[in-house]
Amino acid sequence: LGAALSFEGRSSNVRSIGEPTLEKSIKGAKDSFVETLRTNTALVRRRICTPKLKVVENAVGRKSHTNVAVMFIDGVVDPALVEETCRRLDALDVDALVSTGTFEEYIVDKSLSPFPQLLHTERPDRFAAYLLEGRVGILADGLPVGLVLPVTFAEFMRVGDDRANHFSYAAVLTLLRYLALFIALYLPALYVAVALYHQEMIPTG
């Protein structure tokens, strides 16, 4: 025939897709991200089957050359947000990307802020839902989590299964979380104030 075919037949030792360990799901999907970038992007594409889902890849790390993928939906996300995210990744000057802490330290606005500015999730369904809301997602080879930005404090009061429940039920659960946070913050201070400075308010009889 005068022709030959060549193809790669080796296998790689990678972890198979399993259930989330931190974000347990009751009614939602049971799969989670793994340490392989190609597998993670495929998990997202399975949920968002549109050509408008874009992936911009880059290599981060002077020595590690870790593949990093920026994912977003064209026409939904703010183009300025995508441009700024890619610019900060290009300016990332580190030897190796070994953990998500590198992103936290170098690409956020205020690295010393006590409040997280990136949301970590190991669930592809939650990651895809944020992309549909107009946010930018970051996946990196070797990291079994996806990063979402920008986020507000309210996002950390929601869980992945909120989208699997009816809106009214999810809203009640979110309200209870805020109530629990309020009690945890103010009830101890109120008790100390009453016990030390306003003992007359405590019934003795």
Feature names for model-found ranges:
Residues 1-205:
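Cytosolic regulatory modules rich in charged/polar residues
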